[in-house]
Amino acid sequence: MKRRLVLFLIFMVQFFMAQKKVEDYLHLGDKYRFDNKDYKLVWSSHPMDNFYKQEYILPNENVEKYKRLILIDFIEGDLAPKDVLSSLVNSLENSKKQNLVINYKVYEKNNEYMIDFIMSENSQDGKEVLILERNVYRYFRINTPKRKGVLLFGVSDRAYTKKEMDNMFSVLKNKKLDLVNKVIQIEVPKIK
């Protein structure tokens, strides 16, 4: 009897979790088009009064084990893109001490900033790379009558197997700027 009750409770929790609607805090819609593909809004958060996060993946992917994820964050306030970027660069520099894979390049043009960085999640003993992740983030200053702050548009690519990781390193070696150029070409997402 206890086992049935536990199974029923687990089922109910999963059912209600599946019913939870993802909030479109930035009013961008439940789909976002990038690189001729439609990504669906699968996760969002409003962890602080002035901070919003939204994540999009391809319909056939899982947010816990995605190949590519689009992230759009907005920090409201009198902030400059350079300051928000500096915070990430400081974090990467501090993490480099424990994670030798971390590497990054910052781009700046017309007071807009981008960062292209690679990092990894390693096994507890540090001998094996479990996840290899490449991110390209672009920072925009938003200054409209309704919203002021910094918007981050990011693309996160992940590799989980040795073959996928080798492919990612090959792309970084031979076609590194392809993704950077695609992110450069996007229009500023129109948040409301």
Specify the residue positions occupied by each region the protein language model found.
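Glycine-rich, often proline-containing surface loops adjacent to acidic residues and nearby aromatics
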Residues: 64-74, 114, 146-155
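Surface-exposed amphipathic alpha-helical segments
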Residues: 147-192
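Mid-chain, structured segments of secreted extracytoplasmic proteins
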Residues: 66-103
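Sec-dependent signal peptide recognition
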Residues: 2-8
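N-terminal "mature-domain start" segment
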Residues: 19-49
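Secretory pathway targeting signatures of secreted, lumenal, and periplasmic proteins
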Residues: 37-77
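Hydrophobic h-region of N-terminal signal peptides that target proteins for export
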Residues: 9-18
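Signature of long, low-cysteine stretches enriched in small and polar/charged residues
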Residues: 94-141
